[in-house]
UniProtKB/Swiss-Prot annotation:
[2Fe-2S] cluster binds at residues 120, 122, 139, 142. Belongs to the Rieske iron-sulfur protein family. The main subunits of complex b-c1 are: cytochrome b, cytochrome c1 and the Rieske protein. This is Ubiquinol-cytochrome c reductase iron-sulfur subunit. It holds the Pfam family UCR_Fe-S_N. It is a single-pass membrane protein. Component of the ubiquinol-cytochrome c reductase complex (complex III or cytochrome b-c1 complex), which is a respiratory chain that generates an electrochemical potential coupled to ATP synthesis. The chain crosses the membrane at residues 18-38. It is an enzyme of class 7 (translocase). Keywords: 2Fe-2S, Cell membrane, Disulfide bond, Electron transport, Iron, Iron-sulfur, Membrane, Metal-binding, Translocase, Transmembrane, Transmembrane helix, Transport. The keyword Disulfide bond applies. GO terms for molecular function: 2 iron, 2 sulfur cluster binding; metal ion binding; ubiquinol-cytochrome-c reductase activity.
Amino acid sequence: MSDTEDNRNKQTTRRDFIVLTASSVAAVGAACAFWPIIDSLNPSTDVLALSSIEVDLSSIAIGQTVTVKWQGKPIFITNRTPDGIASARAVKMSELIDPEKDEVRVKAGHDNWLVTIGICTHLGCVPLSNQGEYNGWFCPCHGSQYDSSGRVRKGPASLNLVVPPYIFISDTKIRIG
């Protein structure tokens, strides 16, 4: 009887080995089949390349606004004057359509630099810089006006110009995105 028991143990062991091997091959095959599908959900390399840009601020004069492109959108970078900063901070919150303090819209220690997405929050036109009654931006499409801090002051727009995510790499360089 011991020969029969040994054969059963060997057959069981062989069967277990075959099941385990077949299961492993099936799992690897499934992983190989689904990997391209899962990988296609990642952003492409051209999208990743546009996800952030670095801008040198050293050539932007005081009072000047420069437009750069980030993710297909215009970005207004303004080197504000001390008078412009003072007038933006003197505005009462009750006078604003979308109340937001000037200090919140700029980075601490870099109060002269304002970075905004240059798209009107009403219907998506590109406002003109250094225009309008508030020394900021004027949207030629429907007449919205923004002050020197990019806050909407007049017109159909209900929101301020959006401040994109950015950091100062140095005193003269920022990374947007």
